[in-house]
C-alpha cells in the first residue's frame, strides 16, 4: 500500500525575473518535513514549479500525494489539461507559442508518473497556516546567498 503524503508548496521572487526562492512542507502521519531552496536569477513561475518538483523528488518511494499550491499556473496546467495539450502539441500553446519552463514541466510529468498526485488550489496569503509557512520558507530562501 502506498504512503499517503500531503504536500504544500510555494514560490517567491524578488522582482520577476530576479532572485527567487521556494518552500515546501511534506506531511506523513505526524511527521512534518520542511525544505526550501532558491536561485539567483529566476521567475515566480519557475519557483512555484521548483517547489513542487523538489517536494516530489524528496519522496523516497512511490506515494499517493495531495499537493496544495496557491499557483494557478501549476494547478491549472494539470487540472485543466493544459499540460496534456502542450505535450500533444509538441510544447506549443493554443496561440502556437512555445511553452515556457518546458524543462520543469517535463520533470513534473516524470514525477507524476512515479507518484499518484492530486493537485489542489489554495488561496495565497490567507488563513492557511501551511501555505503561509511555505510562503515564509520561500521568502527566506530568496534572501539567502548561495
UniProtKB/Swiss-Prot annotation:
Q: Which GO terms describe its molecular function?
A: magnesium ion binding; nucleic acid binding; RNA-DNA hybrid ribonuclease activity
Name where it's found. Cytoplasm
Binding residues annotated for Mg(2+) 2, in chain numbering = 10, 135
Record-annotated residues binding Mg(2+) 1? 10, 48, 70
Q: Which reaction does it catalyse?
A: Endonucleolytic cleavage to 5'-phosphomonoester
Q: Which cofactor does it need?
A: Mg(2+)
Note on how the cofactor is bound: Binds 1 Mg(2+) ion per subunit. May bind a second metal ion at a regulatory site, or after substrate binding.
PROSITE patterns reported for this sequence: RNASE_H_1
The RNase H type-1 domain extends over 1-143
Q: Which UniProt keywords apply?
A: Cytoplasm, Endonuclease, Hydrolase, Magnesium, Metal-binding, Nuclease
Q: Name one GO biological process term.
A: DNA replication, removal of RNA primer
GO CC terms, sorted: cytoplasm
Q: Where mainly located?
A: cytoplasm
For this protein, the Enzyme Commission number is: 3.1.26.4
Described function: Endonuclease that specifically degrades the RNA of RNA-DNA hybrids.
Please report which protein family the annotation says this sequence is part of: Belongs to the RNase H family.
Q: How does it assemble?
A: Monomer.
NCBIfam families in UniProt:
PRK00203.1
* Entries under HAMAP family matching the protein: RNase_H
What is this protein called in UniProt? Ribonuclease H
Which organism's genome codes for this protein? Chlorobium phaeovibrioides (strain DSM 265 / 1930) (Prosthecochloris vibrioformis (strain DSM 265))
Amino acid at each position: 500500500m502506498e504512503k499517503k503524503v500531503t504536500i504544500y508548496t510555494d514560490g517567491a521572487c524578488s522582482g520577476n525575473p530576479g532572485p527567487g526562492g521556494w518552500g515546501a512542507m511534506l506531511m506523513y502521519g505526524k511527521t512534518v518535513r520542511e525544505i526550501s531552496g532558491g536561485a539567483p536569477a529566476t521567475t515566480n513561475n519557475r519557483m512555484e514549479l521548483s517547489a513542487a518538483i523538489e517536494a516530489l523528488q524528496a519522496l523516497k518511494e512511490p506515494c499517493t500525494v495531495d499537493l496544495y499550491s496557491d499557483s494557478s499556473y501549476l494547478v491549472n496546467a494539470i487540472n485543466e489539461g493544459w499540460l496534456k495539450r502542450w505535450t500533444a502539441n509538441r510544447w506549443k500553446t493554443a496561440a502556437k507559442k512555445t511553452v515556457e519552463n518546458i524543462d520543469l514541466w517535463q520533470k513534473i510529468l516524470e514525477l507524476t508518473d512515479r507518484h499518484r498526485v492530486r493537485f489542489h488550489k489554495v488561496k495565497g496569503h490567507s488563513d492557511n497556516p501551511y501555505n503561509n509557512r511555505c510562503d515564509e520558507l520561500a521568502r527566506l530562501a530568496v534572501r539567502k546567498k548561495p
